[in-house]
Amino acid sequence: MVNNVLSRLPTAEAPGPMASLSPARRLLCSRAFLPFLALFVFFYYAALLTNGDFILWAPAIHPGDSEQSVFGFVYNNTLLHLLRGDFTIDIDAIGFEALIRDGKAYTYFGVMPAVLRLPLLPFVDLARIDVAPLSCCIAASLATLLKVSALRTACTASTARLRSDVLVWALLATFVLGGSSVPFLRATVYQEAILWEGVFASAFVVLALRGLTARDGFSPRILVLMTIAAGCCLLTRVVMATGLYAGILALLVWQFGGEIVRNSRDAPAGPSHARRGAGFRMPSTGRFIAPLIILAVFASAAGFINYQRFGHPLAFANFSVQTHLPTSHGVHLAGLPALEEYGEFHPRRIPYGLMYYFAPVWFVHSDNGGFLFDDYRKKIDLIEPPPSSFVVTDPLLLMLAAAGFGALCRRNRMALSRPAAALIAAGLALPPVLLLMAFAMAFRYRMEFYPLFVFLTLIGAFGIKPEIAAPRPRSTLGLVLFAMVGIVASHLVLAIYKISPWGDLNPGDDLWEIYQTGIRRFLTRRL
C-alpha cells in the first residue's frame, strides 16, 4: 500500500527514470517534499535560534542594540551607508569590532548579507528594526535545503541506487538536525556571516554534484552558477571563497586542457602545421569566458570595497587598527602579539588547530596554573569556547567522508569523474587548512569544514562503483546510532554555545562553573 501511495506522488525531475528509484528515493524527489521540509526547518530553526520566543525582528532598545541579537544592526547600517556611497559604519552598530582608519569607523564583515536586505527596504525601517535573527534563520534554512538537494542528486544517480535507503534517511536526518546546521543557530553578526557563507558553499557543492552526475557533465550553465556562488561567497567571507575560487578555477583549467587533448586526438595525422590548418580545433572558449568574467567582476568588486575601507584592494581587514573596546560582553584583547609575530596564517599553529577542532582539551588547566599546550597557545591570539569535536557532533559524516577521500585516492573505485571530484575536493579543503593555521580559533569557524565534509560524505556514500561494498557503517543499527549520536551532541553543543563566554578564557576561569552559572540563569529567566 505504501508503495502504491508513493508511486502516485507528483515528482520533480531527478537523474534517471523515476520508476527505477526505491519508494524512499521517490518520496525524497517528490515535489511536495522540499516545501514541507522547508516549513519544518524554518520553524524548528527559529525556535532554536530564539530560545522558543520566535522573535525574529525587534526594534532597537539602545543605539545599535535590540537585545535580540549581538551586533544585529551591523549589516543594516552597512546597507544604509552603501546606498549613500559611503563605506564607513556607525560606531554604535559595530562597537568593539570597529576598525578605525583616518578617524572613521569601518567593518571587516563582507557586504553580501547587507545587500541581501535590499528587498526589506520598502517594508522595514532598517535604521530602527533589527532583522538579524530573521536573516540567520533564512540562511540556516536555505543551507540545509541545499544540502538535502545535494543528497537527492547524489543518491538518485544511476550508479547509487543500490545503496541502502537507511543510509539516505540517516544522512537526511544528519543534514537537517546535525552538526552542519544546528550548532550555529545563534543570532549574532558573526553567525550571520558564517550562515550565509554556508548557503553559497552549499550551493557550490550541489552544483558540483550535478556536474559530476549529469550525462553532459559540467555544462556552461552549471559552470556559470558555480562562479556566481563563489563570487557571492567572496563578498561574504573570503576564507571560504578562497576554496570555491580555487575549486572552480582548477575545474575550468582541467576542462580546457581536456578539450585541447580531445581536439588533438581528433586531428588527422600529418605534419603539425597541416594539423593546425586542417583538423585541429581550438577549444570552444565561450563556455570558459563567461565564468572567468563573472569571477573577475566579483573579485574587482571585493577589491574596490577593500580599497575604500582599508586603502588596499587585497586587504580584507586590518586588525592592527581594531578598537577592542571593553563592552558588556566582556571582550577585551590587549593587542594581537601572535598576529604581529606569526601573521594571520602560520603552519606552526596546525597541531593546536587539530586539537581544537577534533580533540578539544585546550581548556584543561595544567599544573602551573595555565592551560595545556600554553607554548602553542602563545602563537594564537583568540581561542574561543565552547570546546567541541567533529568526532562527537558528526561521526557519520566523518566515517563516510573518510570513505570518500579513500575513493578519490585510489584508482578504479569512483563511479563519477575522479579528476573533477578530486579538484573540487582540493578546493574545498583549502579553507579548513587555512583555519587550522589561523591566528584566531573560534567555534563558528567549524562551518568552513562542512562543505568539504558534505562533499566527501556524498562521494563516499554514493559516488563509489556499485559493485564495491558500501562504506561502514553498513548495518541499519550502525547508521541510526551514528546519526543519533551526532544529532543529540549537536543540540547539546548549541545549548553550551549559547551560554559560553565571549573571547578568550583567562587562566583563572573554570568552564564548568561558567556553564553551571549560565544554566541557572537561563532556567531562572524561563521559570
Provide a role label for each language-model segment.
Residues 147-179, 199, 215-222, 261-264, ...:
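Transmembrane-helix signature of polytopic, membrane-embedded enzymes
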Residues 196-216, 225-230, 244-247, 252-254, ...:
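Specific aromatic-rich, kink-prone transmembrane helix
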Residues 222-237, 244, 295-304:
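Membrane-interface alpha helices of multi-pass inner-membrane proteins
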Residues 243-296, 407-411:
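Perimembrane helix-loop-helix junctions
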Residues 100-138, 156-161, 183-187, 375-388:
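Juxtamembrane segments of multi-pass membrane glycosylation machinery
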Residues 249, 377-382, 386-418, 457:
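Hydrophobic, aromatic-rich transmembrane alpha-helices
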Residues 1-65, 69-70, 162-170, 279-294, ...:
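Start-transfer (signal-anchor) and selected internal transmembrane alpha helices
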Residues 130-161, 203-207, 402:
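Transmembrane-helix motifs of polytopic, lipid-linked glycan transferases
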